[in-house]
Amino acid sequence: MRRAPLALLALVLLAGCSSEAPKPVAPVAKQPPQQETLTGRMAFQKLYQAARLWNADARCFRLESAITKESNGRDGKSGVWRAIFASPGRGIARPFTWSGLTADDAPNPGVAPAGPEDSFNPANTSTQPFDIVYLKADSDQSLEVAQKHGGEAILKKDPNQPVRYILDWNPKKSQLEWHVIYGTAELDAKLNVAVNASSGDFVRVEK
């Protein structure tokens, strides 16, 4: 009667010896940080929300993209946008940035103030705030317009040509305008095309 338990014990020991040891789990490869770019209008929405928390009457008078290693603006988008908002009631202004990049030449991801508060003069027409309802045409649409007025030839000639975008109010024409700048700055730009930010229509070639 003792043979059965002994045989069963032998089978258990044999199974234990023959089973394979668990294999070590391979470490999961670390994924690179997600790099995000946005059109000007999409970035403006994020910046506007932050500015309204800063001051309830905050209004923007300038929005501009930045050129970085990860984002050169050729698709109508940027990984970094900077906006300057004014509080007419308090007579102050403050810049904010949105960043979707983790590069060393870009601000930390997210929305944050980009500097201290400064004085603001509501009577200064060069820094006249605009109403958000005028912003209907986006930066990528403005790029398409600029491409038809000299931009296409520039990008075809130089695949690495950066493109910047500036949004501000034109007090002479009482309209909001995009400035599509083929270059890192307005002064040394190869081309600067103004586009109506409400209708998306071509306005003029500024350079």
Where are these predicted regions, by residue range?
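Long, terminal "pre-/pro-" and other extracytoplasmic accessory regions
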Residues: C17-K207
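Sec-dependent bacterial lipoprotein signal peptides
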Residues: M1-A15
